[in-house]
Amino acid sequence: MVKPYLIEHKDEPLNKELIMHIHEMMTTKTLKNAEDEGKFRTTNDIVVANEITNEIVHQPPTYEEIPEFIEWLCKFVNEPAQGTFIHPIIRAIIVHFMVAYMHPFVDGNGRTARALFYWYMLKQGYWLMEYLSISRIIYRSKTSYENAYLYTESDDNDMGYFIHYHLKVLLNSFKELKAYIQHKSKEQTESLKIMREENLNERQAEILALYKNKTDTVLTVKEVQSRFAVSDPTARNDLMVLVSRGYLEEIHVNKVKVKYVIKR
């Protein structure tokens, strides 16, 4: 997985080899030509087009400019004390923008740009990034993402448009994480309450809490086994305990498969 690799290598300086390896990891088995994985493009036969209209929205700089750009990017990341102070978050956003703008690879530039953004944020001590998913939010607002680039290019490369968009993405990511933590905290509180009142073990209480929080929940032994990382016999026993206590009931889908629902 890419994220553990980014975490493991967050203290390393940025260099050409690291950028290429991150691209290779992000694009393995996803490109038309596997030889393009982890390699900078060597042609100018590349444009960025709108996925729906196929309208060309960006013509990346020539491939001859890529070596100089990579050298600049590494210096920008590795020597932040040089020149005007730029806040680390803004600097990370600039890295994201510039990699996607330059399009140093045949494909997978957006994925690589986002990975480098994550990496730089982790490098600067923003450990919470491990738990955020900006890619999901960018995917949901893809038009705004593309427009942020277009507005920047059309307004004399004023990167403020992209920075503003990206900060909103980060804020929404934090909000989603906060909501998730609050939801899980509520689930845990509910589980502890059930565990005390119903004399169940912690895992059984968590299973029952799932049903109480969402009464149309349907689980199988395999799903419990996967969700709680337990063996088949343990998952089966937990569900049978809840059945024997009158909380759940079995529904036989066929001769083999059994589903468990809350008892009405």
Q: Each predicted region: which residue ranges?
A:
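FIC/Doc superfamily catalytic core
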Residues: 1-264
